[in-house]
Amino acid sequence: MMKHIPIFLFLFFASCEAQEKQNDIALQDEVVKYKFETVASGISNPWGMTWLPDGTLLVTEKSGNLYQIQKGVKTEIKNVPKVYNRGQGGLLDIAAHPNYAQNGWIYITYASSDGEGDGGNTKLIRAKLENGGLTSIESLYKAGPNTTKGQHFGSRIVFDKEGYLYFTAGERGETFVNPQDITRDNGKIYRLNDDGSIPKDNPFVGQKNAKEAIYTFGNRNPQGLAMHPETGKIWEHEHGPQGGDEINIVKKGANYGWADVTYGIDYDGKSISTMTEKEGVENPIYYWLPSIAPSGMAFVTSDKY
């Protein structure tokens, strides 16, 4: 039976003054009354959403459906690509181009079976919304090879102030294979031009066999990505194993350590690494022990709360 799940925006804020070693952000216990308004129901496992300039809300459903919501009316969008709906995979994030009003581009990530091998992996496309369906669909990036494992697809999308597109792909359960190898996809944050081409100043352009779209590596499963409204820097958060969820500021060519360093342990209680720091590895600006499984982030700029 379909569950009626209200959609609401979860806002997360973390102070940038936290010290990664002390992890000592002071949180005030404060009773705050919020009012939740249901804008749509009948969506099972909504995963990503984006607003269009006219106030239309686009929402992805993990199973593969895409909806537009206008003035409380929910309509299913046609011609959505088939997704690899397994485990954590499916129809994932969606983002409107910063200049959507001029060019009409919408960007979508999803688990796709296209490409080499059985199973699926993270794919990025762009498309336009016309007459209730997706048109002009263009494939921008497909991580590979495919795998039948069901975990760690990423895959958040964000644009920076210069118009570059960032998206994430988790390490697909290949803990000791993908994250530290820049010749392989997964366990990475990617940076592209808005048409899917690779910026000439990406950190690994010209390196032999490197995936030139990679902007950072050593990431486990990044599911939060947001641009700081004042600095313009891209922040990300990612899932650790048992413990060790992290917040990081994205830096060009940086290694975020997975799985050479971690604050967490494996799900069977065994150690993954004895190190929480290592030369050449970026330390998180904040981490959680135990894990909270952060699944999305946004900066609060409103003065209403």
Q: How would you describe each model-predicted region?
A:
Residues 21-29, 89-91, 99-101, 172-305:
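Beta-propeller domain segments
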Residues 2-8:
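Sec-dependent signal peptide recognition
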Residues 19-175, 224-227, 232-240, 290-305:
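Acidic, Gly/Ser/Thr-rich repeat motifs that build Ca2+-stabilized beta-propeller blades
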Residues 3, 62, 126, 156, ...:
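Basic side chains
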Residues 6, 70-71, 179, 248:
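Short amphipathic alpha-helical segments
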Residues 14-15:
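C-terminal motif of bacterial Sec signal peptides marking the signal peptidase cleavage site
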